[in-house]
Amino acid sequence: MSDSISVIKEKLSEVTSENDPFFQKCIQDERKGVEKLVQSVRRKWEKEAKLLVKLKEMTQYETDLFQQGYKYIAGVDEVGRGPLAGPVVAAAVILPADFSVVGINDSKQLSEAKRDALFEKIKKEAIAIGVGIIEHDVIDQVNIYEATKLAMCEALNQLTPEPDFVLIDAMPLRYTEAELSLIKGDTKSISIAAASIIAKVTRDRLMQMYDEKYPGYDFANNMGYGTKKHLLGLDTIGICPIHRMSFSPVKESKLHFDSLN
């Protein structure tokens, strides 16, 4: 083959099958550069095949429910149970039956750029999205477990149309009789994964905003979790208005600064 490496790379970007005549010619090309391109294309196809398998696995619950006659299946997930500051945020998402986005997964396993791109995709294509935000003071009043349930119910209450089946990550909600709680549901259900992404991006953006309002805790990077920089902020500055007073490190910081007065 007389084509240059750069030309071959360009042509291979449009090849989709091992049986493509051009790809077969590339296999026969003994140049090291072409061999590397062939290996790269094969790795790309292997990755894409795995993502398609994962997508099929993650739509299985929804597919079964659609076949049973359910029309509006809501996935529900939360983010922010563990942080020392900020709200707990839950999202509920109803996706159309033909929603098919390769790469969607538990939000914690995705890069920020990938989450942001999927966030926009979900917002554009979802039938309905609800977001529940329960602030730090309510968390202190009712405990984080109950606050999480409140956030989930708030998110579900915002959905129009109302869901006729609810898939929930991990915790039983008892929002409706037609619901199923899935352990690690954000890796098993595309609806829950979508809710996970909506909740994560929503809360991260809130915490980035709070970082500007309350500097010194590194909220933009730790999202309120108890990292070294956050704990250092508690030790040197004390608490701020969005800290959860019922969480031990925050409580200890307040006691320390109160004792100095």
UniProtKB/Swiss-Prot annotation:
One Pfam family this sequence matches: RNase_HII
CDD domains according to UniProt: RNase_HII_bacteria_HII_like
Cofactor(s) demanded: Mn(2+); Mg(2+)
Keyword Metal-binding: yes
Catalytic reaction(s) noted: Endonucleolytic cleavage to 5'-phosphomonoester
Record-level GO cellular component terms: cytoplasm; ribonuclease H2 complex
Gene Ontology MF annotations: manganese ion binding; RNA binding; RNA-DNA hybrid ribonuclease activity
Localization (cell): Cytoplasm
Keyword Cytoplasm among record annotations: yes
GO terms under biological process: DNA replication, removal of RNA primer; mismatch repair
Keywords annotated in UniProt: Cytoplasm, Endonuclease, Hydrolase, Manganese, Metal-binding, Nuclease
The protein's Enzyme Commission number: 3.1.26.4
InterPro entries (alphabetical): RNase_HII (IPR022898), RNase_HII/HIII (IPR001352), RNase_HII/HIII_dom (IPR024567), RNaseH-like_sf (IPR012337), RNaseH_sf (IPR036397)
Stretches assigned to the RNase H type-2 domain: 71-259
Primary localization: cytoplasm
Organism domain of life: Bacteria
Cofactor: how bound: Manganese or magnesium. Binds 1 divalent metal ion per monomer in the absence of substrate. May bind a second metal ion after substrate binding.
Signal peptide from the UniProt entry: none
Residues that coordinate or bind a divalent metal cation: 77-78, 169
Job description of the protein: Endonuclease that specifically degrades the RNA of RNA-DNA hybrids.
Similarity comment: family membership: Belongs to the RNase HII family.
PANTHER family: RIBONUCLEASE H2 SUBUNIT A (PTHR10954), RIBONUCLEASE HII (PTHR10954:SF18)
Protein name per its UniProtKB record: Ribonuclease HII
